[in-house]
Amino acid sequence: MTDIKRNFSDIASPANLDDTKKLHVDSTATTKVGRKPIDTEPKSKRTAQNRAAQRAYRERKERKMKELEDKVRLLEDANVRALTETDFLRAQVDVLKNELAKYTGGSDFSDLNLPTKVGHLSHPNNHHSNVSTGTPHGSMSSSNSVASLDNDKPSSASSVSNNSPGFAFDNPWSKDNIQKLKHQHQQQQQKVPQGVPDLVSGSSSSSTPLNDNLLVTPESLTGLSTSSKYTGQNNVPTNLDFTNQFDEQVDPFCVKLNEACGTKSNPVPKFKRSGSKANTSVTNNSPLAHLVSPESQQYTNSSNIDFMNDPFFNGVGTDYNFNFDSKNGSIQDPLSFLQDDNFDLALAFGDPSPTGNEAEADPISLLTTEESIYDPLTNNSDKLCSTVKADDVNTDFNFNDFVKNSLPEKQEKGKYEPPSTSKTTNNNEEEDKDEVVPAPPQTLKCSEIWDRITSHPKYTELDIDGLCNELKSKAKCSEKGVVINTADVNQLLERSIKH
């Protein structure tokens, strides 16, 4: 038997029906149109939470990527600065080597060897580090952003490492590299010429790997300077080679002018050496030769001793000539007694001619008088001082003139010439002006003289060689090199222009 459901209105009373209608009307009146049912609230709450979590995750990911991009940019800038500084320092080393070669006269630097292989970091773009974010989607997005960043901004280090064939990714302190460097160093030592001394003759040779790798061969430096070119993003080569950019004509001009003060091979100035006298055979035929024993009279100075003609010992304007034989100490020097401190030159070589007042000035004759001048009971010291005149003693005796006149080449007429008693202090002071060690205030150095010559309006009409020879005659030696007075430079310039 089937059950048939009955309607509620069939069994409810009329009063109950009125109450249910009122409740239905009240419920419809309180609810608003469009409001979702209550059973959907838990689902919407979960959706809002998921959206907030995704938003926070994206913000954290963007913040992390921005920090990584800033770090990459800083590292790229530091790498570019380091490479630029390396190229600049290498160019400076080449310039200093060339300058050193000019002064030393050779380009052999056997004890300055560096390794030809320098180990450094590999290509930074070959190894990308993916940021792990906890989800596969996040890791893929972060790696893609890093790849896009590297594609947009290529690193300059990659271009340098790709275009620099002089570098290799090898450890400079490896065993193979050390053996190669030792072999190269031995070959360089065999190629060193015997006449050229090393820069550091007493340098200690260490066998540690660090010191071995701090040695630089000239071939390795030249190879690095010529082969290493920094290539930027636009592939513009900037070769920092300043080898032939200095001293176009200043170097030969100054080298020729520096001959006035001597060079490395000839320390004595050339123009004074060429004007020096021929080899002189010095004998002992002086007026004082009778004081020497016959054994020493047979000795004559050989003509092959060239230091007698050296301008350093026998200058044109100097007062000191060393025309004595110092090679053989066993043979007595005929004029050695003149070097004795107890020997009075003024009394020995004074004027022997008697004066009118000699009888009064003779101390021996005064002893025979009735009233002796040396009587201890009387104070006659004033009489003695008044009788002896200062002219009786030759105070202006010049020992150098006496030695010059005593030599055979000075005695052409066979007679002894008395030494000159004129005062030579003024001449000596004038000649000493040419040997001033500190530079005078109004002088010009070689580079300043060359600047003044090249800035002259008639520079093309000047005879540079002739002007240089004239400047050498006016040159002075100082701690700064050759210097010439400004007035002399201007005078010689005007004279050369008139010619």
From Swiss-Prot:
Leucine-zipper, as annotated region: 68-75
Motif interval(s): Nuclear export signal: 462-469
Function statement: Transcription activator involved in multidrug resistance, oxidative stress response, and redox homeostasis. Preferentially binds to promoters with the core binding site 5'-TTA[CG]TAA-3'. Involved in the oxidative stress response in via multiple pathways, including the cellular antioxidant defense system, carbohydrate metabolism and energy metabolism, protein degradation, ATP-dependent RNA helicase, and resistance pathways.
Region (Basic motif): 43-66
Subcellular location: Nucleus; Cytoplasm
Similarity comment: family membership: Belongs to the bZIP family. YAP subfamily.
One GO CC term on file: cytoplasm
Annotated motif Bipartite nuclear localization signal, positions: 20-27, 44-51
Assembly description: Interacts with YBP1.
Protein's name in the database: AP-1-like transcription factor CAP1
c-CRD: annotated span: 446-477
Ranges annotated as biased composition (Polar residues): 123-148
Sequence intervals crossing the membrane: none
Domain notes: Contains two cysteine rich domains (CRD), referred to as the N- and C-terminal CRD's, n-CRD (Cys-254 and Cys-261) and c-CRD (Cys-446, Cys-468 and Cys-477), respectively. A nuclear export signal is embedded in the c-CRD, with which the nuclear export protein CRM1/exportin 1 interacts only in the absence of disulfide bonds (or otherwise oxidized cysteines) within the c-CRD or between the c-CRD and the n-CRD.
Organism: Candida albicans (strain SC5314 / ATCC MYA-2876) (Yeast)
Pfam families from the UniProt entry: bZIP_1 (PF00170), PAP1 (PF08601)
Key words, A-Z: Coiled coil, Cytoplasm, Disulfide bond, DNA-binding, Nucleus, Oxidation, Phosphoprotein, Stress response, Transcription, Transcription regulation, Virulence
Result of changing residue 477 to A: Leads to constitutive nuclear localization
Region (n-CRD): 254-261
Biased segments, Low complexity type: 155-164, 186-215, 417-427
Paired cysteines (S-S): 254-446, 261-477
Main location: nucleus
